[in-house]
Amino acid sequence: MAKSDHILPRDKLLRDNFTPAETLLFGVTLIMASMVNWIGDPRSFWLLGSLLIIGCLTPVILKTHEQTHPFFIDLLWPKFWVCTAPAWIFLLQFIIGLIQNPLGTLILGESIFNIVQPINIWLPSSASDSSTWVTILGFVAIYLLTSTLYIVPKSRSYFERILPLLCFGAVFVGFIGYIQKGLGLTKPIFTNGTGANDFFAYFPYDGHWAAFATLWCCACIAMLLLSNRYDDSLPFIQSVGPWYLTGGILLGASGMLVEALLPSAVLLLTLSVMLLITTVDFLTNSKDIHRKSIALSSGLAACLSFAGGIVRIFQDDAFSSNMFYLRSAAFDMFKANPIFGWGFDSYSKLLPFYSNDLLVGQKYERASSDLLQFLAEFGIFGALISLGFLIAFILRYLLRFRNIRLTNHLLIGCGSVLLIALCDVPFMSPAVFFSFFTIFFIALRWADLSRNKIDEVDAHRPHLITAETKRRVPLFNKQYEEEEK
């Protein structure tokens, strides 16, 4: 943090101790993380309804923050509305789309046929049913709560306390997944399962686990490198560094057990990149007595992980015909309604009208590509809103800060998940959605707190001279001419 060495001990306590809003956000974030990590069904009404209830605490947290924050925060509400604008826009698009439903019925004699009705492509549409409300409001609640991580924390020590707990939670879920694979279980412990074997831990689809593990693998290794940079850090063997490194490798190596080939390949390649960064950091920046052996071990593990990722890419069935047909159907839907798309969760309902004949009788919820499904459901308008938001925040960081290492390492995980979204459906999972925006907003907030004074990060610079139009007394600014009597 800028000029932190010149801060008095009393001011450091004021900065680093939690305010009531920070305490509330800390607890709510951990509760939401526990729920999405352990309740694996991505469309569970219990999960989505609980997330919606927890998300309703967002205005309470912000209002508490406004009343109890010790510094100037006149940018609080402008930041909130800017950060959450995409969520409100998508929710508004969904509500407007309810006025025109593209699905209808045609009755011929005693037969009833489902048809796609003509619609106005210049207005949003929606083919959703009543259950869609819970889904979209649940995801909006997740987004609103995670966005407060970019607004409420006033010190980097907040993230130094919450990130280890979040990393531990993710690693523990991965440990349970390893146990299940080792025991050869056909369904997660204490659940009825889905009937399929492509699960990991409590994630019913292991492609979702691969995206989740990618994010927290980067977070674990990023925390390792951060702890190693502190001047008062212990020798590596005696510090928490080995635990972070073990957790990151545990999460990354799970890619070898994931059946979804392309997501597992991205996970393994991301682990390779993070281990290579660790190798370079220990060789160039560390003064640890074991730095050479640590760098050598990390380098060898990076090579093995890289080789595993390449093998997964070129394995059979990495690009199956069914996935190709599903993506083609999504692209055809997009071409038929390119401006606003067909509405949230409409892909599965319209798929019978656009799918290949080889998929007749098979039920699919997703298009095997979040990007194509997003275009089919939200159109060009939605793509511009979401991508524009991400690009604007990334450009702001790159133009203003750029060299903050923890932020860079966390954003590597976010970028890897966006790559997975090109060929799989990670954002269908509430756990991945929550983890992505949690890490994204933490990374950006860390950058802001690292390069700004604590009393200026959320405030305009104070104007010590009041404008003439706002003064309550007359202002004389003309040249004084003395008159002799």
Positions of PLM-derived features:
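Juxtamembrane membrane-water interface segments that cap and precede transmembrane helices
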Residues: 115-128, 190-204, 321-325, 356-374
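Short, hydrophobic transmembrane alpha-helix segments
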Residues: 34-47, 66-69
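Alpha-helical transmembrane segments of multi-pass inner-membrane proteins
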Residues: 2-36, 50-60, 87-94, 130-154, ...
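Transmembrane alpha-helix boundary signature
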Residues: 61-75, 94-109, 120
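Membrane-interfacial, low-structure loops and terminal tails that flank and connect transmembrane helices
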Residues: 2-16, 66-79, 228-241, 282-290, ...
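Extracytoplasmic loop-helix module adjacent to an early transmembrane segment
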Residues: 106-119, 318-337
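TM-adjacent membrane-interface loops and short helices in multi-pass inner/ER membrane proteins
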Residues: 325-364, 371, 378-383
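Loop-to-helix transition at the N-terminal end of transmembrane alpha-helices
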Residues: 41-57, 338
